[in-house]
Amino acid sequence: MTSTAQPAPPVPQTKAWIITGPTSGMGHVAALELAKHGTVVLVGRGKLAEVEAEINALPDGHAVSVVCDFADIHSVRRAAAQIVALGLPLAGVANNAGMMSTTDGRKSPHGWDLSFATNHLGPFAFTEALIPHLPDGANVVFTCSGVEDSECKPAVVSGFRGGRYISAETSARGEWKPGGSTKAGYDAYATSKQGNLATVFRLAREIPRLHFRAVEPGFNPGTNLGRDASPFLQFIAKRVLSPMAPMIKYWSTPKIAGRLIATTLTDTSDATGVYYDENGKLMQASKQVSDPVFSDRYVAETRELLATVPAEEEKRVPR
């Protein structure tokens, strides 16, 4: 008897979501949330293998890891190329990796200010390398910060004086507009996060087929952002301040912030060029970065600076 059974249809590939900085804090929470929506591409350093195993152990969980040092543009370009080579159906990118140095003078492999390179230059280069491979309607999310706004009262009280951008070149040298913060690392952090917002606003105008979104996760004392702070200060932040966060305005927790990042990345609306606060409500950026002339200049100068980093020479295969 001849069987009339039809072959089973191929199993469709699930969407793949890229998230950087997924090994701790809000990034870790976001990665676990994204696992509910498809494959998670974990990009960063440190405990990538542990998070990958954690997600793969979940029912229907699937994750892959790509090592990347966002302060090193060569590493960033390699990571983007590796992701493209995976052949996954990419659906969106969450640029969450970042740092806040509490000391001045730290440099990237290219000799650039470490915070500016890690928070802005690296994620910008990463995003630009992936854009041609993202489908229409894909979301690109940047974790930003209200400290870029010199009129943000909580940020000012904390010692920030807003973004101190002069040019991409001077920022890379660790030089900032006079009148900034007296606290080491604050101007670098605020200026780099202003760069993230400039990127969102400029690319939303430049590339309408994609959706660019910014998220202000609120003050999160439970993250590893200030990981070069003293062990005592890290203990106070995570064990004393973090539990209080839900009760204080403008504060948040890694769990709340991580879910917000995942929700913003997987949202199917057409929203682009938008900026969400820690509660997922629309918020206003600084007057400076909201000016298209300023954000256009910031992005143009970023591209010019990154163009000075030559492509890596292909490794010759011995014959």
Regions inferred by a protein language model and the residue ranges of each:
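C-terminal helical subdomain
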Residues: 239-283, 292-297, 304
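Pocket-edge positions in alpha/beta enzyme catalytic cores
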Residues: 68, 115, 249, 287-290
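Short aromatic-enriched loop/helix-cap "lid" or pocket-rim segments at secondary-structure transitions
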Residues: 152-156, 224-229, 287-289
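Alpha-helical membrane-targeting segments
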Residues: 162-163, 171, 177-186, 219-256
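Alpha-helical packing segments of well-folded alpha/beta enzyme cores
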Residues: 79, 195, 199, 257-260, ...
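Rossmann-fold NAD(P)H-dependent dehydrogenase/reductase core
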Residues: 2-221, 312-317
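Generic structural signal for alpha-helix termini and adjacent loop/cap motifs
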Residues: 86, 267-269, 308-309
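C-terminal helix-and-tail extensions that cap enzymatic domains
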Residues: 17, 32, 274-319
